[in-house]
Amino acid sequence: FKEKKIMSNVSGVKSKQIVFGTDTDAISAAATATTLALLNSGPWVNAQTVTLTSTGNNAGITFVVVGKDANGAAATSAATTGPNAGTVSVAGTWTEVTSITASGSITTDISAGITSGATTGIIFAGRTRVRSMTGVAGGGAGVVFIKNGSATSGQNRLILDVDSGSTIDPYISDDGLLCEDGAFFAYAGTAVVGLSIQFDG
């Protein structure tokens, strides 16, 4: 007889980032273009507060952010007054940014960043399998949860203890973690700095 090897279906694998902490130029490095050049603009699992930072006075112009809100729906911010030698936050929370545009010429440089990342989030709202995750830990310790159906009350599909300074790369079987009712993320602690999650989408 012939042996047949059955492989898991991993077509259509997507990736999302989980980010914690404050980084004033995570989304866009300091520059003077009225349409900011985006770097790491998502998609993020955990919704982020978007910030604008400048060493100059940009209070005379406004900025509009376009992207996706905490629920993954298309969103456009209200006009946000620019910073005056400091940092200002854009209203709402965001899982992705597709553009940041100024109403006029920028004085000195403007950078866009993130702060206050949520401790829960949606990996994928429908039936999916989480395939892998990789990341780095900072100081402290924490616990990462992958849940089915809800970030708060869903059944745990993975519980991962994270130690200070450790590499986050847990073993996940070839079949992945099946989340019939959607894959959700929850986190408790201070150790995780950044995490990338791959899933069927």
Where do the model's predicted regions map?
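Surface-exposed, low-hydrophobicity beta-strand/loop segments enriched in small/polar/acidic residues
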Residues: 3-201
